[in-house]
Every structure is written in structure tokens, then in C-alpha cells.
Amino acid sequence: MYSNNRVEVFHGDGRLGELEIYPSRELNQQQDDVMKQRKKKQREVMELAKMGIRISHFSQSGERCPPLAILTTISSCGLCFKLEASPSPAQESLSLFYSSCLRDNKTAVMLLGGEELHLVAMYSENIKNDRPCFWAFSVAPGIYDSCLVMLNLRCLGIVFDLDETLVVANTMRSFEDKIDGFQRRINNEMDPQRLAVIVAEMKRYQDDKNLLKQYIESDQVVENGEVIKVQSEIVPALSDNHQPLVRPLIRLQEKNIILTRINPMIRDTSVLVRMRPSWEELRSYLTAKGRKRFEVYVCTMAERDYALEMWRLLDPEGNLINTNDLLARIVCVKSGFKKSLFNVFLDGTCHPKMALVIDDRLKVWDEKDQPRVHVVPAFAPYYSPQAEAAATPVLCVARNVACGVRGGFFRDFDDSLLPRIAEISYENDAEDIPSPPDVSHYLVSEDDTSGLNGNKDPLSFDGMADTEVERRLKEAISASSAVLPAANIDPRIAAPVQFPMASASSVSVPVPVQVVQQAIQPSAMAFPSIPFQQPQQPTSIAKHLVPSEPSLQSSPAREEGEVPESELDPDTRRRLLILQHGQDTRDPAPSEPSFPQRPPVQAPPSHVQSRNGWFPVEEEMDPAQIRRAVSKEYPLDSEMIHMEKHRPRHPSFFSKIDNSTQSDRMLHENRRPPKESLRRDEQLRSNNNLPDSHPFYGEDASWNQSSSRNSDLDFLPERSVSATETSADVLHGIAIKCGAKVEYKPSLVSSTDLRFSVEAWLSNQKIGEGIGKSRREALHKAAEASIQNLADGYMRANGDPGPSHRDATPFTNENISMGNANALNNQPFARDETALPVSSRPTDPRLEGSMRHTGSITALRELCASEGLEMAFQSQRQLPSDMVHRDELHAQVEIDGRVVGEGVGSTWDEARMQAAERALSSVRSMLGQPLHKRQGSPRSFGGMSNKRLKPDFQRSLQRMPSSGRYS
């Protein structure tokens, strides 16, 4: 047991109370130099804290990120110690202080020497323990608030070198020295081929020297017979110690040349600057529509005035670095010293783990920073002028690397770190905290980057998506006559290969780091000691699993605006995936089905917990099975991870996925030979075209389906297996269609071991019951049983479409009868079940329900995406003192920072669904939209936008007379 020590806590001049201090416990017995140094630092901090803790201020409130996640990411020494209030007497001031930290998601800060000590209020796993308890971390001053803002905005740091990375500049003296060197080499060179190369390079230097000479002598140059005079540009003062300058500039846009004068009063300081091609593409990626993806810094060995002018030429509008921050963010290193991220971020504006470096030299950087350096080939416009004209310019590759690093970082932050942090309680220890993401985890080695300059085009994901993505991809696909084929992958290869999606990303220009590093990566939650490993073996496999793109120069798809990665739903991602892989919307050949066939054998997907969204990683297996197939060697049971917590958790940006079980029918259908599938599909199409078969589609997928939609899963591959839509979600959607509400009534089962029972009730009728070892398992089984019972009733009632079945089931209201296909607005819905082969009937209602249900959450996300609104689900945790509603979960929907809907439920899914329903009504009212669209409107067709429907369905809709389409 820990040795107890009491320490007094003050806030300003007021005493809050006493806390007992305990050292952190390290279960890892391996004591390398780094670990020993960390333990030494922790002991020093703890000894200083024992002298008394005086809180000077509070940190900023975390909008998305809990304080523990931020401090885990940026703290170099980890958890320093723990604090817990004494059992008695009660300390009211300390309790209020503790509750304030919990409620506002903030830390209490104590200035400790040259660092800050942050106290993080923690929940206790012991339900009877309502005493204040804290974890303590030590970080550099100011870095917490800076990194909090960056992590909330999904932003990283990027550090650029200047010379031979972004620019090449020469003065008259440097031109003369180099030309003299070429003259000596020409005199000594005997090989005619080498001689020709040297002469050509020297001529390029001479041409630029002549331009610079004209600029120095007459403030003008003659280019292609045209006289170009200088243009005066005003350089504002950077501080009170600087004076505004007026510089004479000449810009030769076609040659990427700028002539400038460092000191306008001294002509000898004139320089000719060659800008590296594709800088504009990289610069536009870093800031899209004013929203920064990276905070930009410069670290160079050049002189300061020269560096400031070079950066002004690169960023004339000051979009990358604000004018007020230039002096702090442009760091000049003296010759003989190494560059260091510690010196770049000396003012605590960023953490080295969150920074990417772009430089043409690796060895000039401190050894500990070298893993975060992406090395680019040196810019050599005189020696190799055609190098930058390659299919993939160097800076486009750098942009792709930055894109992949950012996507990978925040994918792991959202999918691995945040879910685990939400499970951490005061009783846990440092070993239970997962390793945080680090930029170095997502960079390939220098040797591997050589392949990036070719035409190899693996996928990369940048961790962002927006409505602009969908529009641009639709335009690109519709304008193109060629469609990219979907990758035909052996499922034996696809099953163990995991493709991470940082969001519902469009196919962006490539960087293999995303594909390679995560190809067979086990989940970080299951293995906290190796959460971000970078296996390199499946590189060759990964390169063949994706379709190739014609060019890498195009900008990453998600560049303009942004929907947070944590907020994208599976349907949005699925639409983007269909667009990415070039779904052929043209008329299919008569002998081919409209959609690509599934592989002959498809293993059921493992369900991996992920965030609901910033690129949430809740992919379905078809049509992009390879993206989320997880190796069978690393199964995850999300129930075990989230089971039986007595307290609600921190706000989470991922959806909790239940382990749904696929039926034997699904496995059988997946193993069906392609020819059998083709014959059956053709038969189903013919059945769908029967004269008396009139399909009906509600605003969302309803229980009343046309024969074409009930035929089988092949017609809707994107809805075949939903890894994110639980049975409770499906049942809730059915209840919405009925205008009713599903109620779950829990109880205990009399047995030797602890078991839970949950009954599902709809319209005062019991429709199902489930028993399990946990409430979640029991609820899941109850929902499945309810769907099965409803489906059985529906099938019995639908055996004869006549009116005699109108009251076959009790689940009816004035709008919908679950037992009658004719009840909805009295529209005919003829269905000839006998015309279909037995194998084509839907034998697993759970799968049918999963296919049909889209829900209010999906509708709300699509509405927000179409209107350019930013949506987020937030959870509100009850304080320990609230014993009455302790088991209830509260969810709220924030749109553009404004709460528009709230929900309460016994599960997170139930609370979130209720909040989404209320928010959907509010948003539609604010936007002036009708709450109920016309039943047959094309926009509500099948609950999906037309781009998600099979071409056969689209054409049948176009041929349908207006009386059949509109009410």
C-alpha cells in the first residue's frame, strides 16, 4: 500500500482543505535510462508538492478533449502522483472545487518552478467513494492551453526549412563563385557527356546572373523582349523596434522567379529567388477556407532578415503565420548548432510529439527530433530543372505526407486514446493509460520516401470531410467516361488487412504511411503496451489493394471547409466510398449485375470500437471491405471494454458498437458462387417488374418494401452488413415509423449467477425479452428478439395482401400498421411471395431491419452536411451526488456550438437517438423546411439520395408515372 502523506491545498489565499498524496505506481519493471529519468522527475515534482499546493488559476475548459487525454499526449514525465481527500471530516470547499473541475472539464494549475502542475479531477470506480480525488501532471508553462486549442481544432504543428527546401536564392557574389567553379571543372573534365551537363548547368546560372545584374543596375529586366520594371511593396513593421520598409520587387510568375532586395538601401543585397513548384498546392492545403490544419513554423540556418523576406515571399498574405507571430515562429539557428523542436517551441506553443518537420537534410536536426522529419530532395533548379516537372512534384508528396500524418494522428487520438481515457478512473495507474499518438508513428523512413516520387498511388486519408467533398467527387465522376474499377481482392488477403479511415474521407492523394503502418495493426485498446506499432510487412499487399489514380498532383479531396472527424456517420462515409471507388452508374451489360459481385468467401467483420465520425471508423465491409477488416488474431469485444461501469463517462466522439452476430444465412449467401448469384439476381429483377408489383418507399427505409428491396442483400451491398447499426437502433427506427416509443424494462433473474433481464415494450405491448450477463447484452438480445417477433408478425400478415390481415398484429397507430402492407396512406403494395424462390426470401429479419433503418441521426447528419453546419454529440455526466438519476445517460446535440436537442436514456444510443429526434425537428424549423416531406418526393426516395441507389432503381423511378410517385 502507498505511504500516506497529507498536503494542504490553497486557492489563492483561501484554504480548500487537505489531500492525501500517493506516488504513481509503475507496473513495468524495465528501467531504461528514459524511465529512470522520468521517475526521478516524478519524485522531484512530488517532493515540491508536499510543501503545499497553491492553485493559481484554472486551465481553459475542454470542448472536445478531456484534460486527461491532453496531458497524456503532452506530458513528458507522465502521471506524477495522486491526491485523494481524507475520509473525514467532510471538506465542503474542496468538494465544490472538485465538482467545478469535473463540470467544466478543466484542470487546476499550480506554478511549480519553471513548470505548471495540473490537477485533473478524476471519477472513482468505487460508487460509494464521493471524496474528491485528482491526478497530477507536470508540463511546460502555457503548453496545455496551446495544445488544447490545437487538439480541439484537429490541428498539428509543421516546421519548414527554407533554403533548398522551399526556395533557392543567389546574390551576384554567389552566382560568380559558382560560375567560377564550373569553369574550373570544365577545364579539367575529359568526359564529353559530363562536360555537356556541366556546361548546361553553368548556362542556367549565367542566365539568372544576367537577370539579377539588370535588376541591380536599372531596377528592371528584359524578359522575352519585354521590359519589366520593379513594383514597390510595403513591408509593415514587425515590432516597435522595426521600421516599415518599401522593397522593389520583380515577379516573373512563369519562371517562379522573384527579384528582391533584403536591404532596400543597399543594392548588393539584391537576390534572385527561385520558388519551388507546387508550393501553392501545399500552402492551400495547410489552410482551407481560413481553418488551419497545421500551425506553421520556420527553422533555418539563414540570417534573420533574409529568412523574414523569404517567408514573406512564400506567404505574402500572412495566412500561414500571423504578422504578430513572425518573430517568434521564424527561428534562426547559428551555424554549428543543430536544429531542435524544443527551441522552435520554446514559448510553449506546441509539443514536439505534435509537430512534423519538412527539410532537405536530416542530420542538421537533433537526434531525438529526427523521427519526425520528412526529408525531401534538395531543390536544385539549375542542376536538375526537370525534377520538379515530374508527375508528382516534391511538395505534392510533402503535402500528402502531412495529410497522412494528420489523419493518422487524429484517427488514433479519437479511436484509441479517447475511448480508453473514458474508461480510466482514479483507481487505475499509469500503466493503464495508453500510449499517446506521436507524429513519428506515421512517417515512413527516408529510404521508403523515394517511392513517393513515382506514380505509385496508395490511398491516404487526411482526417477531414465536408459537403464540398461529395459535390466535387460527384462532378468528377459524372464528367469522366472512365470509371475506376473496384479492387478485386482475394478475401483471404482482405480479411487480415486493416485500412484505417481517419474520417469519411474521399480518396485523397497518396502517402503510403497510412496504408503500410496500419495494415495489420491490432487495436490499441486491446494492447495498450503496443498501441501504435508500425508493421512494415504488408507493404506489397497494400499497394495492390487499391485502385490507381492518374496523378498525385491533385489536391486532397477534403480541402475546403470541414465537418469534424468525430461527427461523420456511416452513411455519409459509405456514399463517399462509393464515389471514391467509381461506382458505375451507366447501363450495365445485360449479362452483368448492376453492382460488383461480392467475393466468393467473406469472413464476417470484427466489430471494432471507434468514434462516431472525424474520419469515426465504423466502416462496413461492402463495397470497401478492405478498409475495416480486422485480423482474426486480434478480436475485440467492445462489450468487455464498456461493461458494467457504474458511472457515465467523459464526452466521447465515437459510437459504441455492440457485437452483432451475423446469421448463418448471411454466411451462406456470402459463399454463394457468382453464377448462382447472377441467376438469382436476374430472377429477382424479373419479379420486380411484374405488373402488380408497385414499390413503395417512405422517407426512411420502412417495413413496407418492394420485392426488389426484399429480394436479397446483393441489391444493396452498402447496407449488407452494418457494423455500426445495433439492433436497438433498428428497433428504435421501427418505433419511430409507428409513432411510438420503445421502452426497456430491466430486472434481475433468479439464478445462481448474476444475470440481467430486459423486456422491450412497444405501444403498451411486450414484444421481446433478453437475458444476459450484463445490461448491455440483455438489451441487445431483447432488441434482436423484438425485431424477430415483429418480422414474424409482418411476414404472417403479409402472406395475403388482402384487407383480412389489417389487424394481424397489435402494433398499429393512425399512420402505420406493422402487420399490413396496405395501411400506409392506403397505397397498394402487392407482393407475390410465391413468385420468388425460397432462398431469396428474407429469412433473417435482423439483417432486413438493419438494411431498412437509417434513423433520425442519419437524417440529421445529412441535413447538417447539406447546409454546411457543424454537428457534435456531447454527453453530460451526472455528478456523484446525483444518486437518483445515476444510471441515466444524457446526450445533447450541438450545431455550430448551440445546443438544439437533448435526450435521456438508459443507454447512450437511446439518449443520442432521442436528442437527434428533437434536434432534427428544431433544425428543420430553423431552416424553414417542412417537418414531413411528401411521401413520394424524389428527395425522400428510399430514405437515400439518388446517388446511393442502384441504377435500375433510378431508371424505374424515372419511368414511373407521376401518379405512382407523388401523392
UniProtKB/Swiss-Prot annotation:
Listed Pro residues bias regions: 590-603
Short name of any one Pfam family annotated for the protein: dsrm
Span list, region Required for nuclear localization (NLS): 945-967
Effect of D161A: Loss of catalytic activity
Alphabetized GO MF terms: metal ion binding; phosphatase activity; phosphoprotein phosphatase activity; protein serine/threonine phosphatase activity; RNA binding; RNA polymerase II CTD heptapeptide repeat phosphatase activity
SMART domains referenced in this protein's UniProt entry, alphabetically: CPDc, DSRM
Induction cue: Slightly repressed by ABA.
Residue ranges, compositional bias (Polar residues): 955-967
Places the protein is found: Nucleus; Nucleus speckle
UniProt xrefs under InterPro entries: dsRBD_dom, Fcp1, FCP1_dom, HAD-like_sf, HAD_sf
Tissue: Expressed at very low levels in roots, leaves, stems, flowers and siliques.
CDD domains: HAD_FCP1-like (cd07521)
Disruption phenotype: Grows more rapidly and flower later than wild-type plants. Increased tolerance to salt stress and to ABA during seed germination but more sensitive to freezing damage at the seedling stage, by the enhanced expression of abiotic stress-induced genes. Hypersensitivity to MeJA, accumulates high levels of anthocyanin on medium containing MeJA. Confers wound hyperresponsiveness of JA-biosynthetic genes.
Activity profile over pH: Optimum pH is 5.5-6.0.
GO term, biological process aspect, one: abscisic acid-activated signaling pathway
A GO CC annotation given for this chain: nucleus
Biased composition (Basic and acidic residues): 665-684
DRBM domain residues: 724-792, 855-925
Region (Disordered) residue spans: 548-611, 643-712, 928-967
Details of cofactor binding: Binds Mg(2+), Co(2+) or Mn(2+).
Quaternary structure note: Interacts with FREE1, ANAC019, MYB3, MYB4 and MYB32. Binds to DMS3. Interacts with RCF3. Interacts with RS40 and RS41. Interacts with EIF4A3. Interacts with UPF3.
Swiss-Prot/TrEMBL domain comment: DRBM domains are required for interactions with target transcription factors such as ANAC019 and MYB3.
UniProt-recorded name of the protein: RNA polymerase II C-terminal domain phosphatase-like 1
Taxonomic placement: Eukaryota, Viridiplantae, Streptophyta, Embryophyta, Tracheophyta
